Amino acid sequence: MRYGEKEIQEFDPKKDLEIWPNKHNKPYKIKITLPEFSCLCPRSGYPDYATMHLEYIPDQYVVELKALKLYINSFRNRYISHEDSTNEIFDTLYSKLKPKYMRLVADFNPRGNVHTLIEIDSEEIEKVSNG
């Protein structure tokens, strides 16, 4: 097993998803594109590919980019649906970073004539929750 495979296989987001202190007091937005997301369809086992678009306004923390890359890559051999993977990534990052705002868009490549786009927005969640 090569070192990269080992890092991905052993990645544990609870301990390995590194966050850093945000040194800036002014509000600013971070936009990250992760074009190589992959996971396995829980029904067929076929691979699913997506581009993840993450944007957030940090409060006290920012995510370390190599750790984020390894976290995203850790899905590549998991049997998980589009909805579950997107929600898990959003929930994990949101709970670790506690940002002022976060939005995750998962743009899955078409497969079987179906194109899936999943968006999770912390402001929308708050609006719906507060009714």
From Swiss-Prot:
Keywords: Cytoplasm, NADP, Oxidoreductase, Queuosine biosynthesis. One of its GO terms (biological process) is tRNA modification. It catalyses: 7-aminomethyl-7-carbaguanine + 2 NADP(+) = 7-cyano-7-deazaguanine + 2 NADPH + 3 H(+). One of its GO terms (cellular component) is cytoplasm. The keyword Cytoplasm applies. Catalyzes the NADPH-dependent reduction of 7-cyano-7-deazaguanine (preQ0) to 7-aminomethyl-7-deazaguanine (preQ1). HAMAP family: QueF_type1 (MF_00818). Belongs to the GTP cyclohydrolase I family. QueF type 1 subfamily. This is NADPH-dependent 7-cyano-7-deazaguanine reductase. It comes from Nitratiruptor sp. (strain SB155-2). The gene is queF.
